[in-house]
Regions:
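Active-site gating loops and adjacent loop-to-helix segments of metal-dependent hydrolytic enzymes
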Residues: 1-40
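C-terminal functional module detector
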Residues: 10, 35-41, 46-188
Length: 188
């Protein structure tokens, strides 16, 4: 199974690693730097690639890497959080990562639930029925968050100002009348 580095080692604490000769990535497939300019272009490019995989029906669990010791990131700067209900051990952690019960961050800790379920849950609806999924979040952060975005099938479906979320922890509902995916991201 493929596991994708969504928070990859190009993302450093105060800057994004890039090749000054090309204005793009230091390695890997280059992005269109005119459409996705430095400094946030790499993050948007990484997300676009990930969204294309999800839109193709691939269930690619998110992961992260900091390249500590190679780049100036502290250990664990880009990190993956894995939801483990059962015994916490190496085998269970890897099993849950592979199942997609994870999220990545290099900032806030997002404890999101969809209809009370953690990340990675697969919802099923009867044929021809619309599925309405309530979303909630507990967010712990030392960073200033401007807004929270709900991304559905690669497009921003909702933007919630952080101040609005603080009132009750609700992110509203997301609806599906066909197969798809969604994610929650905090914008710092």
């Amino acid at each position: 199974r493929i596991i994708s580095g969504i928070a990859n080692n190009h993302m450093c604490r105060d800057w994004v690693y890039f090749n000054p000769l090309t204005g793009g990535e230091a390695w890997g497939r280059p992005r269109d730097v005119k459409r996705l300019p430095h400094p946030h272009g790499n993050a948007h490019w990484t997300q676009e690639i990930y969204y294309h995989a999800l839109n193709a029906g691939l269930r690619v669990p998110p992961s992260a890497g900091s390249a500590s010791g190679v780049l100036p990131n502290p250990l664990g700067y880009n990190r993956v959080w894995v939801h483990v209900d059962e015994t916490f051990d190496r085998e269970t952690w890897w099993k849950n990562l592979k199942a997609g019960r994870s999220f990545v961050s290099n900032g806030p800790l997002l404890r999101c639930e969809a209809s009370g379920k953690p990340p990675g849950h697969v919802f099923k609806a009867a044929n021809g029925k619309t599925l309405n999924i309530p979303l909630t979040a507990k967010i712990f952060t030392g960073d200033e968050i401007s807004e929270i975005e709900i991304v559905k099938n690669g497009q921003i479906a909702a933007t919630i100002p952080f101040e609005n979320w603080k009132k009750n922890g609700s992110l509203g509902k997301i609806s599906f009348n066909e197969s798809g995916w969604f994610l929650v991201r905090a914008i710092t």
